[in-house]
Amino acid sequence: MLDIKRIRTDFEAVAEKLATRGVDAAVLNEMKEIDAKRRNILVKVETLKAERNTVSAEIAQAKRNKENTDDKIAAMQNLSAEVKALDAELAEIDAKLTEFTTTLPNIPADSVPVGADEDDNVEVRRWGTPREFDFEPKAHWDLGEDLGILDWERGGKVTGARFLFYKGLGARLERAIYNFMLDEHGKEGYTEVITPYIVNHDSMFGTGQYPKFKEDTFELSDTNFVLIPTAEVPLTNYYRDEILDGKDLPIYFTAMSPSFRSEAGSAGRDTRGLIRLHQFHKVEMVKFAKPEESYEELEKMTANAENILQKLNLPYRVVALSTGDMGFSAAKTYDLEVWIPAQNNYREISSCSNTEDFQARRAQIRYRDEADGKVKLLHTLNGSGLAVGRTVAAILENYQNEDGSVTIPEALRPYMGGAEVIKP
């Protein structure tokens, strides 16, 4: 959520920044006018309350003097009626302001590339060289079916489109991947957490999914509960409405969880395979940091995600997302895109973002600065470390052999009982 004071005092700069995210200046102007009206009403209310207090004191004095108080009582009643009417108007204005501030995206950092969409993203670096095959590489969905480790047909029968069963070494591979990821992040100082997979609406508001993106989620009917779209939600809300000790920052959390997404608006995209599912496993990283340290922590988090891909020897690239392609809550985002041979393209496998104080303001996560003792909003960061299903897809395609088998990456073999190959 944006700071209304920043919009008020630095309006032109904020409007210019948000314009790069598709926010019409007219919306901000309307918000500014409503805020000005609110402040004027507040002044009137305080003035009227002061007058009412004065009249109340005069009435008390008049009664002590046994004087007639009818006129003063009538005046106080009129003042109270005016205050009540203005309070009602103020409540309506506050509701409008809340609607504005909760649906506007975060202000992009100065270092974010300006652009309309993913075509304006900027490649930062690459790692590894895509493998050259001396045979036609298969898509991971065909490999998975031929190996008998991925079953979309029965997933569709039991549930519906974009669901599947992992079987045998496929299930073992999925489990090996996320255990490996959690172990690697643990080495980097992340505390492993098992979170609830169901959260309440306040938690969804805190991280920015609600109210703007309700259609992308799975709500439990007639309840206050939602299936988590990512472990970012419970991990970030762990400290909601709390004040942390500044000396304890930064704090690192990691968790593996299922993620549930309706994929509204994704009809026709990635209809086959593991790239876009309604339910998938993901290892998440979340950080709580002081404002002056958060961008250094973003670079470290991105490196933590890269470490997984490097140890799995999967070629990838890092791109800085443009203002038009970033997520709602992000001030800056790096995407990691892994090489998918059958698509001859890089596809997103991780997204690492600094939300600055955007989520912290919504969730009221603060810290007490040990230097001056003041309570301040901290910065929150989140990143995939990594999407597990997409990692399975990348391994199947990059490690496939001409005979249809798939070599298991060396880093995962200790997690798979020493198995080296998945064979038909």
Curated annotation (Swiss-Prot):
EC number from the UniProt entry: 6.1.1.11
Binding annotation for L-serine: 230-232, 284, 384
Pfam families attached to this UniProt entry: Seryl_tRNA_N (PF02403), tRNA-synt_2b (PF00587)
GO cellular component: cytoplasm
SUPFAM superfamilies named among the record's database cross-references: Class II aaRS and biotin synthetases, tRNA-binding arm
Residue sites binding ATP per the record: 261-263, 348-351
Pathway: Aminoacyl-tRNA biosynthesis; selenocysteinyl-tRNA(Sec) biosynthesis; L-seryl-tRNA(Sec) from L-serine and tRNA(Sec): step 1/1
Family according to the record: Belongs to the class-II aminoacyl-tRNA synthetase family. Type-1 seryl-tRNA synthetase subfamily.
Domain text: Consists of two distinct domains, a catalytic core and a N-terminal extension that is involved in tRNA binding.
The name this protein goes by in its record: Serine--tRNA ligase
Organism: Streptococcus pneumoniae serotype 4 (strain ATCC BAA-334 / TIGR4)
